[in-house]
Amino acid sequence: HSFPKGIIRDYPDYSIRGFMIDCGRKFIPMSYLQDLVKIMAYYKMNTLQVHLNDNGFKQYFDNNWDKTYAAFRLESETYPGLTARDGSYSKKEFIDFQKQAATNFVEIIPEIDIPAHSLAFTHYKPEIGSKEYGMDHLDLFKPETYQFADDLFKEYLKGDDPVFVGKRVHIGTDEYSNAKKEVVEKFRAFTDHYIRLVEGFGKQAVIWGALTHAKGDTPVKSENIIMNAWYNGYADPATMIKDGYQLISIPDAMVYIVPLAGYYQD
């Protein structure tokens, strides 16, 4: 008897094979996230982006920002009371989750989504919300806004054993108003600031594609920056590649699943 012999080569076409889950609009239990990592590993997916904050649309809440649902899911000692009461993750379990995922060759990319999608933060600290563009927008003209967000990111980035364990951190940066040139320039400066903040802690910054929608003169760092290209109207892929960004293509109409939303071909 003889056994056939040979070489099997198994390798991916794409270095990042990812999935994003929105834990902001709806709480996702840690046990579910742990199971999801195991399933991803089985299918040789290697990146899970965990969207830690978001909010609903005010038109579904009597057009009242105060009534509109919003949540931030991670324990915060810097801002006691910020963390959602209807479901959250302790720092310890989030650290353990990231380390366990790494043993399955899955990198967790935590996302704190600012300066839009930020109602959880303005519910906590109303004075940093934008009266002009909506309370789900941080007011980019106030120094207090930067102080708040700086301290929040630093809580999870600093120290020898930081809460954000992996090599990448997502800073959000999508769907902010472009109604006026001055606010566009502020948005671009804000984006650049938080790219450099996370880089200062040795992390690679990941951003949502928004710089076509927010076209302006203020430079935004592109070297070694990953951009989630989700809609061409917000970030034209050809332009973004020319500008030096590394793109991950996630076209919303084809890959987003938003239950009962009605606007993603579901």
Give names to the regions the model predicted.
Residues 12, 22, 60-61, 221-222, ...:
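Alpha-helix initiation/capping motif
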Residues 29, 57-60, 117-120, 179-181, ...:
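Extracytoplasmic/secreted cell-surface and envelope-processing proteins
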